[in-house]
Structures are given as structure tokens and as C-alpha cells.
Swiss-Prot record:
The keyword Endoplasmic reticulum does not apply. It comes from Aedes aegypti. The lineage of its organism: Eukaryota, Metazoa, Ecdysozoa, Arthropoda, Hexapoda. Salivary gland (at protein level). It comes from the Eukaryota. This is Aedesin. Antimicrobial peptide. Exhibits antibacterial activity against Gram-negative bacteria, such as Escherichia coli, Pseudomonas aeruginosa, Acinetobacter baumannii and Klebsiella pneumoniae. Shows no antibacterial effects against Gram-positive bacteria, such as Staphylococcus aureus, Enterococcus faecalis and Enterococcus faecium. Exhibits antiviral activity against all four dengue virus serotypes and chikungunya virus. Exhibits leishmanicidal activity. Partially neutralizes lipopolysaccharides (LPS). Keywords: Antibiotic, Antimicrobial, Immunity, Innate immunity, Secreted, Signal.
Amino acid sequence: MNFTKLFAIVLLAALVLLGQTEAGGLKKLGKKLEGAGKRVFKASEKALPVVVGIKAIGK
């Protein structure tokens, strides 16, 4: 009957609507990873000259 066509349309609509919700969670995770990467980069920028200076003194 037409039940299979109706079921397919409802299923497709649900996938489209619920698929957008999933992207929000992945976006939040991406932002957290990006923030962690920035913090590590800034910390290494501060620490690297100190490490190079200690290594130069030890020569």
C-alpha cells in the first residue's frame, strides 16, 4: 500500500531534522579541541625561549 511510501517520507524527514542536531554536538567538540590547541600553542611559545636559553647556557 501507500504505507511504505509514507513511512519512507517520514523517515527521510526525521533523518534530515535529526541530522542537524548532531552537527551541533560535533561543532562544540571541535571548538573545545581548537581551544585546547590554542592553549598548548601559546604555552609552547612562552616555554620555548626559556628551554633554548637553558640549553645555550649549558654548552
